[in-house]
């Protein structure tokens, strides 16, 4: 009996000891994670101000498998039609840091075996600047396991090592493209990460990143070196890449640059020697270059073939980006002129193609000119939509600018004009019933804007519209006008009660005067609008919008009910357009039927909300949204929409349910193409 009691007491003591040890280990784990979370607060970030960081980067590419689909993928055109399978690229640059978030990068030396010294897979550069202590590791993607806000997404295992070091292994609780796996070595007393490894998949790139954090020479919150192994797979194409980046390299001795070739210069900069395989890539490239030069002297290359492959093909399928001016103060960016990846589909407008050109020219640090041509062609409507703003910014600090904008806007309906026309139309005259009440809208706006303070912005200007009947011939047969013109002075004031990060209240007034610059329409309109985005963290936020508008003067049946803050979006632009402030299922004619409107829109966006937790498909979901929209106009009291949306590497999708005056009004799906948007 005594022996059994002694055994029982011993076991209780052992169990209590084990529980105490487990509690101590748990407290150690939590305290270590807290030290990691708080470590950036102990780092002096003023060292970044005015700091120049010299960087060496090497990229080796192996094209394992390729087909015609590789051609239109951004930056892939050169390696898609080249005969070679292996490439190497080296880069030496300097990063001029002004603060922790403001910097410019200047390329000092570059050599590449990619045809015409082009760059490829530039998307990988983002993976070479990880920020482990911030909420997202790479820009606005991939949640860091070492930020307090992401603690709920990861599991951790700890192993105590010697010399005050701890090995931490981490993996996500659910498989998702926004989460990573890996391990790091951490100083247990400070929470400082020394080196480690992470792996994940994002935007069709599977990657493994080995990194060493910087010593005190730079800053312990930025890496000293990164080695990236990546694989890109898409519709039968497989491309592997090895990317190395070394930060804190010695500054370039400019006195010795002039006498060296670019290859010799890179040999003198490189932190170590090339491998046998890398040297072989260079040797094969220069041998082929010499052979092409010899053959060119004997056989004149077909001009048509060179133009098609080297000029036309590249510019048609790839983005064009270039600097110009004596000091490279100008920059132009052109989306592909013809690339099937920029196609889209909308139920009302059918298939459409989007096109975008941006131009920026800096006259000084405070003055610049910005222009952007954004266009889209609807094949169903046989209509080219475009907007062309030309902005001259004269005071960068106060966002002072003068803007001239041209555009042809949406098709706008006018049922009253249609009824008048049909009453005058000879009987038995055929017409297109689907298009008869629509008018094309060409508009011209001239306005000036100035931020008088962080609370007040004032805008004044004029806006003109010329609206022409889509079925112009039918209106001519009825002997009624086919076009109408309005010219309106306008004023707008934006009030931010708490400054830039709070809500913005907008009051807009517009008055068209008959006879002003040959205008034949008169109206007066007032709109109120309030918008706010509440950011809970880097990837989770709530956006809210509410507003109303009404016509105080409406002269005759020939006028058009058209609002600035309540209008149809003619060319949808995917996840990053105004999905958070528009009505997805509302037929387009409702935007132009009422002399008033009252609307509210709210959207909640976050990763890992619902579908992300479903096996197999959840791993591909990047972000998710919940939508709620409500509208009051004539004959709609109210119109409501609720929806759920998500975005993946391929498409963004939204499912919406509409109710009209309390009754079910339908279900709809909206799809936007996201493929290679970030490339």
Give the predicted meaning of each segment.
Residues 347-349, 359, 431-464, 498, ...:
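Outer-membrane beta-barrel transmembrane strands
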Residues 349-353, 382-386, 440-444, 481-489, ...:
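Residues that define the transmembrane beta-barrel architecture of outer-membrane proteins
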Residues 363-369, 397-402, 454-460, 467-470, ...:
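Repeated loop/turn-to-beta-strand initiation elements of outer-membrane beta-barrel proteins
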Residues 353-359, 388-392, 444-450, 462, ...:
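Residues on the lipid-exposed face of transmembrane beta-strands in outer-membrane beta-barrel proteins
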Residues 157-158, 163-261:
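Gly/Pro-enriched, hydrophobic low-complexity segments
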Residues 23-165, 174-179, 237, 241-345, ...:
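Structured extracytoplasmic
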Residues 194-200, 228, 333-345, 356, ...:
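Transmembrane beta-strand segments that form the barrel wall of outer-membrane beta-barrel proteins
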Residues 401-418, 428-434, 500, 506-610:
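C-terminal outer-membrane beta-barrel translocator/porin domains of Gram-negative envelope proteins
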């Amino acid at each position: 009996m005594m022996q059994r009691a002694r055994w029982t007491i011993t076991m209780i003591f052992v169990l209590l000891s084990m529980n105490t040890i487990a509690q101590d280990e748990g407290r150690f784990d939590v305290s270590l994670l807290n030290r990691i979370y708080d470590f950036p607060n102990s780092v002096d970030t003023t060292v970044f101000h005015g700091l120049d960081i010299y960087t060496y980067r090497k990229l080796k590419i192996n094209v394992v498998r390729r087909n015609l689909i590789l051609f239109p993928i951004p930056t892939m055109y050169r390696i898609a039609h080249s005969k070679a399978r292996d490439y190497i690229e080296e880069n030496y640059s300097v990063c001029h840091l002004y603060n922790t978030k403001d910097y410019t990068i200047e390329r000092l030396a570059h050599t590449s075996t990619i045809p015409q010294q082009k760059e490829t897979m530039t998307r990988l550069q983002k993976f070479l600047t990880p920020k482990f202590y911030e909420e997202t590791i790479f820009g606005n993607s991939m949640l860091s396991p070492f930020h307090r806000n992401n603690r709920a997404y990861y599991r951790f295992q700890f192993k105590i090592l010697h010399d005050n070091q701890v090995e931490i292994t981490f993996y996500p609780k659910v498989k998702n493209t926004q989460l990573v796996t890996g391990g790091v070595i951490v100083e247990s007393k400070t929470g400082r990460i020394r080196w480690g490894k992470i792996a994940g998949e994002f935007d069709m790139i599977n990657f493994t990143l080995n990194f060493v954090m910087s010593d005190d020479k730079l800053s312990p919150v930025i890496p000293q070196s990164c080695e990236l192994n990546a694989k890109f797979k898409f519709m039968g194409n497989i491309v592997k890449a090895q990317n190395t980046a070394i930060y804190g390299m010695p500054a370039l001795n400019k006195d010795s640059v002039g006498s060296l070739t670019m290859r010799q210069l890179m040999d003198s900069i490189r932190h170590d020697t090339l491998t046998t395989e890398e040297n072989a890539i260079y040797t094969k490239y220069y041998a082929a270059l010499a052979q092409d030069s010899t053959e060119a002297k004997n056989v004149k290359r077909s001009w048509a073939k060179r133009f098609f492959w080297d000029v036309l093909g590249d510019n048609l399928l790839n983005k064009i980006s270039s600097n110009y001016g004596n000091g490279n103060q100008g920059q132009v960016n052109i989306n592909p002129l013809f690339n099937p990846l920029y196609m889209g589909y909308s139920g009302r407008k059918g298939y459409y193609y989007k096109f975008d050109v941006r131009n920026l020219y800096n006259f000084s640090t405070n003055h610049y000119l910005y222009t952007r041509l954004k266009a889209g062609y609807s094949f169903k409507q046989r209509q080219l939509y475009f907007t062309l703003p030309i902005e001259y910014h004269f005071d960068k600090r106060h966002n002072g600018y003068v803007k001239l904008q041209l555009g042809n806007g949406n098709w706008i309906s006018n049922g009253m004009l249609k009824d008048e026309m049909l009453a005058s139309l000879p009987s038995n005259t055929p017409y297109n019933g689907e298009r008869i009440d629509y008018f094309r809208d060409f508009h011209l706006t001239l306005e000036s804007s100035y931020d008088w303070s962080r609370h007040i912005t004032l805008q004044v200007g004029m806006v003109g519209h010329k609206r022409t009947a889509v079925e112009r011939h039918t209106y001519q047969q009825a002997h009624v006008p086919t076009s109408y013109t309005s010219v309106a002075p306008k004023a707008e004031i934006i009030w931010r009660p708490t400054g830039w990060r709070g809500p913005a209240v907008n009051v807009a007034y517009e008055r068209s005067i008959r006879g002003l610059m040959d205008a034949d329409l008169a109206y007066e309109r007032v709109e109120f609008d309030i918008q706010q985005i509440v950011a809970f963290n880097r990837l989770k936020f709530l956006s809210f919008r509410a507003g109303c508008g009404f016509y105080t003067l409406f002269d005759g049946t020939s006028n058009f009910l058209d609002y600035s803050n309540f209008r149809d979006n003619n060319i949808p632009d995917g996840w990053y357009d105004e999905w958070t402030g528009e009505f997805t299922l509302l037929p387009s004619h409702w935007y132009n039927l009422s002399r008033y409107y009252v609307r509210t829109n709210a959207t909640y966006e976050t990763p890992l909300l619902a579908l992300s937790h479903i096996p197999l498909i959840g791993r591909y979901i990047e972000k998710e949204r919940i939508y709620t929209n409500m509208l009051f106009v004539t004959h709609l009291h109210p119109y409501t929409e609720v929806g759920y949306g998500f975005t993946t590497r391929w498409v963004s999708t939204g499912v919406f349910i509409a109710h009209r005056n309390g009754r079910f009004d339908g279900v709809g799906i909206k799809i936007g193409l996201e493929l290679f948007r970030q490339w």
